[in-house]
């Protein structure tokens, strides 16, 4: 009897997939460069704190870029939705590296000291909450989760707004005074959140602002 053989269809990469990989590659360049600066003694008098700070700063930057996708589309018509998931995941990876640096290099895996910091130092508490909120977003940033969760997926990913607000507050509270840098980032975050609140009203006035679908946070 002749055995029936099935033919497997080879998965062909989607058009423009290389752009996503290029984005991921470029996204990790700051981490590699910062690690190089630290390894070669170019991060100043307190390299651990500087390394930790820069990783956290890049996490906030990528969160801002993630939320900028929608205003850019609304105001210019340029659609970057396919890159939003990658930007959101990069933000999570940097936030995780930021916390890992604090936990391993700063505190030396002293769990008692880490827990004490989280409980007693408000800016660390807020930072930890923000990181915790990003975890389910990163874990569900895939097509399977979108299909499985349905409408709940969009509701879940609205947590990104709380996470980015907490990240901005964490940055502001981590400095003894308020220099320009954290204030500028906080202002950008505030503007993005205000845009999100005003967007439904703007869409009723300008039909062009109505997107085909509401993609939140880390979704492609």
From Swiss-Prot:
Subcellular location: Cell inner membrane
Co-factor remark: Binds 1 FMN per subunit.
Domain of life: Bacteria
Primary location: membrane
Entry's transmembrane regions: 20-40, 52-72, 86-106, 122-142, 153-173, 175-195
InterPro entries the record matches: Fe3_Rdtase_TM_dom, MsrQ-like
UniProt topology in membrane: Multi-pass membrane protein
GO biological-process terms attached to the record: protein repair
Cofactor(s) required for function per UniProt: FMN; heme b
GO cellular component term of the entry, any: plasma membrane
A GO molecular-function descriptor: heme binding
Keywords: Cell inner membrane, Cell membrane, Electron transport, Flavoprotein, FMN, Heme, Iron, Membrane, Metal-binding, Transmembrane, Transmembrane helix, Transport
Subunit structure: Heterodimer of a catalytic subunit (MsrP) and a heme-binding subunit (MsrQ).
Family from the record: Belongs to the MsrQ family.
Biological function: Part of the MsrPQ system that repairs oxidized periplasmic proteins containing methionine sulfoxide residues (Met-O), using respiratory chain electrons. Thus protects these proteins from oxidative-stress damage caused by reactive species of oxygen and chlorine generated by the host defense mechanisms. MsrPQ is essential for the maintenance of envelope integrity under bleach stress, rescuing a wide series of structurally unrelated periplasmic proteins from methionine oxidation.
Name of the molecule in the record: Protein-methionine-sulfoxide reductase heme-binding subunit MsrQ
Species the sequence originates in: Brucella canis (strain ATCC 23365 / NCTC 10854 / RM-666)
The organism's taxonomic lineage, starting at the top: Bacteria, Pseudomonadati, Pseudomonadota, Alphaproteobacteria, Hyphomicrobiales
